[in-house]
Amino acid sequence: MIIRNTMIHDAIHPEPFQGDIVILSGKLISVGGKAAEADEEILDASGLNAYPGFVDAHSHIGLDNYGGPTGTTFDYNEMNDICCPQLRGYDSYYAHDAAIPMGLAGGVTTVAAGPGSANVLGGTFFAVKLYGNTVDENMIREAIGMKCAFGENPKRCYRDKSDSARMTTAAKLREMLYDARDYMMRKEAAGDDLSKCPKYDMKMEALIPVLKREIPLKAHAHRSDDIMTAIRIAQEFNVRITIEHCTEGHLIVNELKKAGVPVAVGPTLTNASKLELLNKSWETPGILAAAGLQVSIITDAPVIPQQYLPLCAGLAVKAGMDPFQALQAITINPARHIGVEDRVGSLEAGKDADIVLVNGDPMVSDADIRYVIVDGKKLVERA
C-alpha cells in the first residue's frame, strides 16, 4: 500500500512534513518523500494528517467485560490474595470485549493491559494490538511489567484481612522481594544439582524477571508519599520502575527528575473519587514534560473509555502542555514506557504500519478519524 500526499506527524520530529508512506507486509518501508509508481494499492490522503497509532500505556481493556454489571464481570483483580505476582494479565483478556473496537475507532492501536490495583502485587501486564480473535494473535509482549500498588486501593480491599496502613503495603512488597531474591540466589547456587534447588514456587519465579531488571515494577501510585515509597523500594532492590497515575507528580518534580523514572499520568477525565485524587490536574503532564521527564498520558480504561485518549492529550494541551509533547505522550513515550518502541509509537521505516489518518488534529474534539491502519490493514474506514 502507498499512502499518498499526507501531512506526516511522525512523533519524532516536532514539525510535520508532506509526503508519501509506503507499506509492505505490514511494515513501514519509507516515510516521507515521493514514492515511486508501483503496482500497489494507493490511498490518496490529500488533506489528511498521518499519525502513529496511539498507544495507551495503562488500561484494563479486555479484562473488564464492557457492559456487564459493575463488580460482577471484571477479571482484573484477584480479591483473595494480596500478593499474587504469578498471575498473567493475558489469561483474563477477552478479545471480543465490546470496548476493543471502540478504542480502535478512536485511533488507539496498541495498549498495555493487565491486573488492577487491589493487590500489593497483582501480576504481569502485557502489550497487545486492538484487533483479532484471540490475545495470542496480536500480542506484542507477554510481560511488560509487574503490577504493584500503593495507597488507598490495597488498604480498602484488604483492610479486614491483612493491610490497613501504607507502611503495611510497603512491608509486604519488601518481604516478597527479599524472599524472591533469596529464592533466586539459592536457585542459581544449585546450578544443575536439582537436589539443592529450592522447591518450585510460582510467585518467586514471577519476580525473578523484576530482580534481573528484565521488566519493571509497574507501580500504581497517586499521592506524592506513595510515589516516593515506590521509588525508595525500587532503589533498595536495584529494580526498574515506572510510576502509574502519578497524580501528585507535579508536587515532587525535582525528586522525580532525580530518580529519572518514566511516568504515566491519568486518568484525569474523572471525578476525585477518593482522597488521593484531590490534587489531580490537567496541568500535571505538561509540568512533568517541561521538566524533562518521559511522560505518557493514560486512560486507565475502563475508567476513561480508551477512545478518549487523544482527547485527554488535548485537554493537557489546553492546560498548557506543549502540543508536540502531548502527541508524544500518546505515541512514542507510552511505547517506550512499556518497552515496545521498536515496533510502535512513531512513523519510522522498519516499524509496524500502524497509522491514523485524520481530518484535523486528533487532540481537538471536532477532528474526524478517517482511517485506522494496523499492521498495514485498514481496520477502520470512514467516508
Predicted regions and their residues:
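N-terminal metal-binding scaffold of metallo-dependent hydrolase/deaminase domains
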Residues: M1-D39, L48-A50, D361, K377
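C-terminal cap of metal-dependent C-N hydrolases
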Residues: R4-D10, R336, E348-A383
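Divalent metal-coordination and catalytic microenvironments
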Residues: T6, I21, G26, G47, ...
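Active-site gating loops and adjacent loop-to-helix segments of metal-dependent hydrolytic enzymes
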Residues: G68-Y93, T134, A149-P154, K196-C197, ...
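Active-site core of metal-dependent hydrolases
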Residues: T72, G89, M184-S281, S296, ...
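Polyanionic/metal-chelating signatures
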Residues: L104-M228, R232-I241
